[in-house]
């Protein structure tokens, strides 16, 4: 039960399976002042103690760090949590992670979507395996010990090797954690969430067959 305010509409990415990324074009952002005022009013007028910054990809907002710093001025003293449900791997920076950690104490969620670089390129998910690992490294260095990775199965051109790559990617993240220095006895939790591809109208994959 939380307040929700939309920070942007549309998406700059163009993943070929994502209907929302096409039907909500063009991409446009709300200003920092408007978002901050809406969130403040929602919490003060309706009694919420958590506000979600909603969008297809919240970390793509060009002034997200400024927005979070401004919201934390009133949110921290009043114990209001900020939820950022959509974080892009290639948009994360150490400063942004530091701000996220102040408002999100649990784990982080990222979406590589596919288990191989070939398939990520095919679906226009423009992130590399190295970016996945680099972002997880930043997360671990910031003190996080839980990471959730979202993937899809049944994507067009998918092979068994792509499926195996999902487990391989998760294992690389685990190995990365244990290759770093941590307090003794502090383990890592890497959760894999897998959804089945469903072809959607108005996307490049709209006429692709769905696996049975």
Q: How would you label these PLM feature ranges?
A:
Residues 2-33:
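Canonical Radical SAM [4Fe-4S] cluster-binding loop centered on the CxxxCxxC motif
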Residues 8-9, 24, 38-43, 47:
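Conserved catalytic alpha/beta cores of large enzymes that bind or transform nucleotide phosphates
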Residues 22, 123-127, 206-212:
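Short glycine-enriched, charge-decorated loop/helix-capping segments at active-site entrances
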Residues 25, 156, 205:
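Active-site oxyanion-binding pockets that recognize sulfate/phosphate
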Residues 29, 160, 209:
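Ordered, soluble secondary-structure elements with a strong preference for glycine-centered loop motifs
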Residues 40-195, 199:
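Conserved SAM/AdoMet-binding glycine-rich loop
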Residues 194-212:
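Radical SAM enzyme [4Fe-4S]-AdoMet core and its adjacent flexible, acidic
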